[in-house]
């Protein structure tokens, strides 16, 4: 299985980010993929994997997994990286948008300079 990903960190929390709009892993295979990708000796390495998905309840869904393959609800640094990824990779051109994670909607406000996200406020 070939999956394109991006490795990002926010204040020391490092995750593997997967664009769920273009990359598809069956739900039942995700825990195994997460464990492999998160392994710092044999995989990419990270605190876990975050899938950036479409959502009916917000502009994006942050589907977050811990390194052991279990689901997680929220990481403040992780959601900031999702916001930066979504804007910088062209998933949105708006500086204000919403992300749902763990059943809760959070609102992002980005500071963008020359097309690059420089700061993110989460409400």
Write out the residue ranges for each language-model feature:
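A glycine-rich beta-to-alpha transition motif near the start of alpha/beta enzyme domains, typified by
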Residues: 1-116
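Short, solvent-exposed secondary-structure boundary/capping segments
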Residues: 116-123
């Amino acid at each position: 299985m070939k999956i394109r990903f991006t490795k990002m960190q926010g204040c020391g929390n490092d995750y593997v980010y997967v664009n769920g709009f273009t990359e598809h892993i069956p739900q039942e295979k995700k825990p195994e993929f997460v464990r492999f990708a998160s392994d710092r000796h044999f995989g990419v390495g990270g605190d876990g994997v975050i899938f950036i998905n479409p959502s009916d309840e917000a502009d994006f869904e942050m589907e977050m997994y811990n390194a052991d393959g279990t689901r997680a609800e929220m990481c403040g640094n992780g959601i900031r990286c999702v916001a930066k990824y979504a804007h910088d990779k062209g998933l949105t051109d708006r500086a204000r948008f919403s992300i749902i994670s763990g059943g809760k909607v959070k609102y992002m406000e980005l500071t963008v300079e020359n097309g690059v996200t420089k700061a993110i406020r989460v409400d």
